[in-house]
From Swiss-Prot:
Region named Beta-hairpin: 363-373
Positions of the record's site feature: Forms salt bridge with Arg-417, probably closes bottom of cavity: 147
Keyword check for Thylakoid: no
Phenotype of the disrupted gene, per the record: Disruption of only this gene, or of the lrpG-Rv1410c operon leads to increased levels of many triacylglyceride alkylforms; up to 100-fold increase depending on the exact form. Cells grow more slowly on lipid carbon sources, conditions thought to mimic infection, and grow more slowly in infected mice. Disruption of the preceeding gene lprG leads to loss of expression of Rv1410c due to polar effects; in infected BALB/c mice 1.5 and 2.5 log decrease in bacterial load 15 and 35 days after infection.
Forms salt bridge with Arg-426, probably closes bottom of cavity, annotated site positions: 147
Periplasmic compartment segments: 28-45, 97-109, 165-169, 222-229, 291-307, 358-378, 429-474
Stated role: In association with lipoprotein LprG transports triacylglycerides (TAG) across the inner cell membrane into the periplasm; TAG probably regulates lipid metabolism and growth regulation and plays a structural role in the outer membrane. Mutagenesis and molecular modeling suggests TAG (and maybe other lipids) enters the central cavity of the P55 transporter from within the cell inner membrane via clefts on the cytoplasmic face of P55 between TM5-TM8 and TM2-TM11. From there the lipid is probably transferred to the hydrophobic cavity of LprG.
Transmembrane intervals: 7-27, 46-66, 76-96, 110-130, 144-164, 170-190, 201-221, 230-250, 270-290, 308-328, 337-357, 379-401, 408-428, 475-495
Protein name: Triacylglyceride transporter Rv1410c
Example of a GO biological process term: symbiont-mediated suppression of host innate immune response
Induction remark: Part of the lprG-Rv1410c operon.
Main subcellular localisation: membrane
Keywords, ordered alphabetically: Antibiotic resistance, Cell inner membrane, Cell membrane, Isomerase, Lipid transport, Lipid-binding, Membrane, Transmembrane, Transmembrane helix, Transport, Virulence
């Protein structure tokens, strides 16, 4: 019945929203988490693992489990994924009670694997339950739930902590909400919903992709940054291994009979260009979500709530840019908006890269007529720029992929963005820590040798602030360059007149006999 499929897709969208929220929710509560698991403030780089391992699990699981649902059924895979999400949430919350950092990482990884399956399965479910001519709005709504999570996640985390006074409750709340989604799915979907001709799962391709990303992340992480080496001793061999795995992945996808994405009808130049631009946008997004708050705490000496409040300007501008970008793209085309949006974002990050230690007093003079706060203005510019490209990149990707593969193509855009987040935050964190120790060593040498103990302590504190400011300045400069590179790729995405080659196929029957397409 129509009511049943609406309940099912609502439950799937709720699950997608929860997974997206938990991708970003930790960004604004990192200080509380650090205190609970015993990470000192001078080891900020360790806490990034709660983000990177979630993203790694998410990216590794998405293509494999999405395809697995074709073989084993949407209902079964959704229920298994939701159960895994509950387990991961419980482990993460308990890690806070026990103060166990490794348990925390394990919980976040389980969460990532589970939530990575939710988006492609729910997209496929929408394609099953709605006929082709009516499914665009349904798939768009599911995608909107994913995007909404990226906007609300940081605010959701700080709100729950403000309301309940404990960061663990962010994860405990997942248990009843996910259980509700499981009950809705149980009663709204038939038990036997496997495809009559199930597709084979590209297990080799998925494992090669996960291996490449995992080796890259571990190779980039230096647990003991000393300002002399960017990478740990084992870093270079692991990065070489990641490169080999990546080459093997692309080689496999080129010649294998079963692939993550069927190349038939796909226009690969604009498709890969859109994914590349999504990687750049994802890297910039995650660097902002992580490093702006750390700048507030490490340089401006803000508390957690104040530092999270800095992000509010960026997070408000992001959806405004997304809505505006979608509206403009229908008139000017996706290519122009993607190019302009990433250039605007690059300009915003160039402004952010010049943030001084006394940022709160810094202002921009606008044509000599009036002044505006530099911090707020720069974050709004970056947020608007990144927001502008969300719709055009997704639209351009889907336009050059046959409609039968729109679900996996939508997931590919998310995978590309999260790959950018994962590799971007790992690589820039490694570079930042390397440069921080170099900068700090140079600044410390400027302390007069005859300074008193109090003067020396004050000078050291000021030097740490200055070193943090310079380090983040370099990180955001690189982020601006990444956005410029993404803008160039934006020029190569599909125009409005370029479309995929649609194969001649008949409309497939719906998932269950009792469901009638509109």
């Amino acid at each position: 019945m129509r009511a049943g499929r609406r309940v099912a897709i609502s439950a799937g969208s709720l699950a997608v929203l929860l997974g997206a929220l938990d991708t970003y929710v930790v960004v604004t509560i990192m200080r509380d988490i650090m205190n609970s698991v015993g990470i000192p403030i001078n080891q900020l780089h360790r806490i990034t693992w709660i983000v990177t391992m979630y993203l790694l699990g998410y990216i590794a699981a998405m293509p494999l489990l999405g395809r697995a649902s074709d073989r084993f059924g949407r209902k079964l895979m959704l229920q298994v994924s939701l159960a895994g999400f509950i387990i991961g949430s419980v482990v993460t919350a308990l890690a806070g009670h026990f103060g166990d950092f490794h348990m925390l990482i394990a919980g976040r990884t389980i969460q990532g694997v589970a939530s990575g399956a939710l988006l492609p399965i729910t997209l496929a479910l929408g394609a099953d339950l709605w006929s082709q001519r009516n499914r665009a709005g349904v798939l768009g709504g599911i995608g909107a739930a994913q995007e909404l999570g990226s906007v609300l996640g940081p605010l959701y985390g700080i709100f729950i902590v403000w309301l309940l006074h404990d960061w663990r409750d962010v994860f405990w709340i997942n248990v009843p909400l996910t259980a509700i989604a499981m009950v809705m799915i149980h009663f709204s979907l038939p038990s036997h919903d496997r495809s009559t001709e199930p597709e084979r799962v590209d297990l080799v391709g998925g494992l090669l992709l996960a291996l490449a990303l995992g080796l890259a992340v571990i190779g980039l992480y230096n647990p003991n940054p000393d300002g002399k080496h960017v990478l740990p001793d084992y870093g270079a061999p692991l990065l070489v291994g990641a490169l080999v795995a990546a080459v093997a992945f692309f080689g496999w996808e080129r010649f294998a009979r079963t692939r993550l994405i069927d190349p038939a009808g796909v226009h690969f130049r604009p498709f890969l260009s859109a994914l590349g631009a999504s990687v750049a946008a994802g890297a910039a997004l995650m660097v902002t979500l992580v490093d702006v708050e750390l700048f507030g705490q490490g340089v401006l000496q803000m508390d957690q709530a104040q530092a999270a409040g800095m992000l509010l300007w960026f997070l408000i501008a992001l959806p405004i840019g997304a809505v505006t970008g979608g509206w403009i793209a229908t008139r000017a085309g996706d290519r122009a908006v993607a190019f302009a949006g990433l250039l605007i974002a690059a300009y915003g990050y160039w402004l952010i890269s010049h943030w001084p230690v006394d940022l709160l007093a810094d202002r921009h003079n606008i044509l000599g007529l009036f002044t505006v706060p530099a911090m707020h203005t720069d974050l709004v510019v970056a947020g608007l720029g990144l927001g502008l490209v969300i719709g055009p990149l997704s639209s351009a990707t889907l336009r050059v992929v046959p409609s039968a593969q729109h679900g996996i193509a939508s997931a590919a855009v998310v995978v590309a963005r999260m790959t950018g987040m994962l590799i971007g935050v790992a690589a820039l964190s490694a570079w930042g820590l390397y440069r921080f120790n170099q900068i700090l060593a140079g600044l410390s040498a400027a302390i007069p040798p005859n300074a008193s103990l109090l003067e020396r302590a004050a000078a050291i504190g000021a030097r740490y602030q200055q070193a943090f400011a310079l380090m983040y300045g370099e990180i955001f400069t690189i982020t601006a360059i990444v956005c410029v590179f993404g803008a160039v790729l934006g020029l190569l995405i599909s125009g409005r007149k370029e479309h995929a080659d649609e194969p001649e196929v008949q409309e497939q029957p719906t998932l269950a006999p009792q469901v009638e397409p509109l």
